[in-house]
C-alpha cells in the first residue's frame, strides 16, 4: 500500500534492483563499504549489506528533503508542538543536553537538570541508608527503558544496591521478587506518568503492604500530588516528570531513578552524555551523513519499497538481551498508526513488526527461517568490539558468529541439494559499539529514537501519542468488577460466555 507520489521514483529504483544480489551491489560500487558506513562517537554503523544502490539512496534522500525532515528535526529540538493530537512538545532531548538555542528547550533543560540534582541526592541517601535492594514498579515506558539500561550496565560485583523490576499485573511476578528480599532492607519506587495505571497501582499496593507502610517508598510521576496521596509518600520522596516527555522516551528523566540506583549516578549522567552526543549529530549532520536519518530511510526502503513486514534485532552481547523488547515499544507504539497527522488515512504501510533476541542463542531458534524461509526479514545486528569480561576466546567466538551470520544472510550459498541451498539476499545493518559503556548505550538508544521520528515525518504520522492502547484498558476496567462477583452488563456475546466459564 504505497500510492503517495513522493515514492514514485523510488518504486522505479526498487523495480530496477529487483534481481540484484548484495554481492553484485558490492562489486558494482567499489567504495560502497566505506561510503555506506558512518562513525558517530562510540558507534560504527554499516548499511553496505542493504539492497539499495547509490542512485536509490539519493532518491531516498530526495524524499527526506521533500518531506522536510531536517526542519522537522529542528522543530522537535526547539520544543515546538510536534505532538499535535495531544497539543504537546516532545522534549526528551532536553532531558540530556542543551543543544539548541530555543527558549522552550532551554527552560526544559534547566528544569530537568534541577530535578536530576534532586534525584542524585536521593540516590546517595539510599546508598548510605543500609538498604540493600530496591523494587521498581512500573510498566511500559516506566519499566522497559530502566530495566534495559540497568541490566546492560549493572556492575558484575560490588553494586551498592540491587534493583529488581516488576511490571506485569500477574501477582506471580511480585511474589517471586519479594520472596528473595528482606522488607527491612528494601525500598520501593512506583513509576507512573498519570498514577492511574492499573498494573502499577495494584503492584504498588502489594509492595506498600509488604514494606509495612510508605517510609521507604518513592514515586516518579507527572502527577506528583496524586502519587503522594495514593500511598502517603512524603513529598520529598516524589520526583516529577512532565507531559512533554512521552513514556517510551522517559528513561532520561526521573524515570531513570532506578537506573541511577543500579549503576550509580555518575554513570547515569554518562548515559545522558552519550545520548546528547547523538542528539547533536542528528541536529547538525547533513541528511546524507546523518546516522538516524539513514537508519530511518533504510527502514522506509525495506517496508514501503520492498514490502517486508517484519524487522529483527539481534544483539550479540548478552547484556543487551532486553534491547529488542525495548525497541518493540519504542518503534511499534510510536509508528503503529493508520491515520496521518490531519486524521486522514495513511497512503503507505507503516510500522512492521519488530522482534528479536540475543546471539548466539537466536541462531538455534529462529535463524533457520531467516536463512531459508519464504519471508525476507531485514535485521539489525548489534555487537561490541571490546568485552569487559575475562573470557577473550568466548568474545572472539561471539564476534565471529555475528560476522558469519551477516555474511551468510547476504551472500547465501548455492547447492545442488535444494534442502541445503541458501538463497541469500537477506539485508542487514551492522551496528558496532566500541564497548558497552553508558555513553555508547545512550548514543545507541538516541539513534533509534531519532530514526523513529524520521520515519514518522516521512509517513506524516504522530510518533508521540498511543491512543491504540486505551480501548483494551477501558474494557478491562469494566470487566474487573464482573470477575469480582458484581452483576455487570456485558454487551459482547463471546466475553459473556468466557466470563461464565471463568466463574464455574
Swiss-Prot record:
| Catalyzed reaction equations | alpha-D-glucose 6-phosphate = beta-D-fructose 6-phosphate
SUPFAM superfamilies named among the record's database cross-references: SIS domain
Q: Which UniProt keywords apply?
A: Cytoplasm, Gluconeogenesis, Glycolysis, Isomerase
Q: Which residues form the active site?
A: 333 (proton donor), 364, 473
Q: Which GO terms describe its molecular function?
A: carbohydrate derivative binding; glucose-6-phosphate isomerase activity; monosaccharide binding
Q: Which InterPro entries match?
A: G6P_Isomerase, G6P_Isomerase_C, Phosphoglucose_isomerase_CS, SIS_dom_sf, SIS_PGI_1, SIS_PGI_2
What are the subcellular locations of this protein? Answer: Cytoplasm
Q: What is its main location?
A: cytoplasm
Annotated GO biological processes are: gluconeogenesis; glucose 6-phosphate metabolic process; glycolytic process
Q: Name one Pfam family in it.
A: PGI
EC assignment: 5.3.1.9
GO CC aspect terms: cytosol
| Pathway where it operates | Carbohydrate biosynthesis; gluconeogenesis; Carbohydrate degradation; glycolysis; D-glyceraldehyde 3-phosphate and glycerone phosphate from D-glucose: step 2/4
User: What is stated as this protein's family in its record?
Assistant: Belongs to the GPI family.
Q: What's the stated role of this polypeptide?
A: Catalyzes the reversible isomerization of glucose-6-phosphate to fructose-6-phosphate.
Q: This chain belongs to which protein, by name?
A: Glucose-6-phosphate isomerase
Please give the organism: Stenotrophomonas maltophilia (strain R551-3)
Amino acid at each position: 500500500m504505497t500510492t503517495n507520489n513522493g515514492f514514485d521514483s523510488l518504486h522505479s529504483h526498487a523495480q530496477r534492483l529487483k534481481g540484484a544480489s548484495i554481492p553484485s551491489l558490492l562489486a558494482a560500487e567499489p567504495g560502497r563499504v566505506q561510503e555506506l558506513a558512518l562513525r558517530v562517537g562510540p558507534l560504527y554503523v554499516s548499511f553496505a549489506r542493504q539492497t539499495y544502490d547509490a542512485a536509490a539512496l539519493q532518491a531516498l534522500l530526495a524524499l527526506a528533503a521533500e518531506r522536510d525532515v531536517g526542519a522537522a528535526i529542528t522543530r522537535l529540538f526547539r520544543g515546538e508542538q510536534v505532538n499535535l493530537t495531544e497539543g504537546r512538545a516532545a522534549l526528551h532531548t532536553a532531558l540530556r543536553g542543551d543543544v539548541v538555542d530555543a527558549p522552550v528547550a532551554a527552560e526544559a533543560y534547566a528544569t530537568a537538570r534541577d530535578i536530576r540534582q534532586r534525584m542524585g541526592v536521593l540516590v546517595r541517601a539510599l546508598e548510605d541508608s543500609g538498604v540493600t535492594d530496591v523494587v521498581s514498579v512500573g510498566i511500559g515506558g516506566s519499566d522497559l527503558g530502566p530495566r534495559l539500561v540497568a541490566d546492560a550496565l549493572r556492575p558484575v560485583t560490588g553494586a551498592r544496591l540491587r534493583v529488581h523490576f516488576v511490571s506485569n499485573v500477574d501477582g506471580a511476578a511480585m511474589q517471586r521478587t519479594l520472596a528473595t528480599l528482606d522488607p527491612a532492607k528494601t525500598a520501593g519506587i512506583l513509576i507512573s506518568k498519570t498514577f492511574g495505571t492499573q498494573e502499577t497501582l495494584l503492584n504498588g499496593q502489594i509492595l506498600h503492604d509488604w514494606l509495612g507502610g510508605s517510609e521507604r517508598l518513592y514515586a516518579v510521576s507527572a502527577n506528583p500530588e496524586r502519587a503522594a496521596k495514593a500511598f502517603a509518600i512524603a513529598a520529598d520522596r516524589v520526583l516529577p516528570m512532565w507531559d512533554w516527555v512521552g513514556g517510551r522516551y522517559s528513561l532520561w528523566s526521573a524515570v531513570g531513578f532506578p537506573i541511577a540506583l543500579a549503576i550509580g549516578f555518575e554513570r547515569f549522567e554518562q548515559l545522558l552524555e552519550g545520548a546528547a552526543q547523538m542528539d547533536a549529530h542528528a541536529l547538525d549532520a547533513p541528511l546524507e551523513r546523518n546516522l538516524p536519518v539513514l537508519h530511518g530511510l533504510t527502514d522506509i526502503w525495506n517496508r514501503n519499497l520492498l514490502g517486508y513486514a517484519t524487522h529483527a534485532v539481534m544483539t550479540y552481547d548478552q547484556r543487551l538481551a532486553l534491547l529488542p523488547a525495548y525497541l518493540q515499544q519504542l518503534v511499534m507504539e510510536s509508528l503503529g498508526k493508520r491515520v496521518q497527522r490531519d486524521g486522514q488515512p495513511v497512503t503507505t504501510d507503516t510500522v512492521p513488526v519488530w522482534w528479536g533476541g540475543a546471539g548466539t542463542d537466536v541462531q538455534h531458534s529462529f535463524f533457520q527461517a531467516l536463512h531459508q524461509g519464504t519471508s525476507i526479514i531485514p535485521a539489525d545486528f548489534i555487537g561490541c568490539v571490546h568485552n569487559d569480561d575475562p573470557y577473550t576466546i568466548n568474545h572472539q567466538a561471539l564476534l565471529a558468529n555475528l560476522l558469519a551470520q551477516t555474511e551468510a544472510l547476504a551472500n547465501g550459498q548455492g547447492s545442488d541439494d535444494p534442502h541445503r541451498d541458501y538463497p541469500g539476499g537477506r539485508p542487514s545493518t551492522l551496528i558496532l559499539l566500541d564497548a558497552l559503556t553508558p555513553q555508547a548505550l545512550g548514543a545507541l538508544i538516541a539513534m533509534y529514537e531519532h530514526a523513529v521520528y524520521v520515519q514518522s515525518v516521512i509517513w506524516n504520522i504522530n510518533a508521540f501519542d498511543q491512543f491504540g492502547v486505551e480501548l483494551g484498558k477501558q474494557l478491562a476496567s469494566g470487566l474487573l468488577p464482573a470477575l469480582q462477583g458484581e452483576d455487570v452488563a456485558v454487551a459482547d456475546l463471546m466475553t459473556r460466555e468466557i466470563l461464565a466459564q471463568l466463574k464455574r
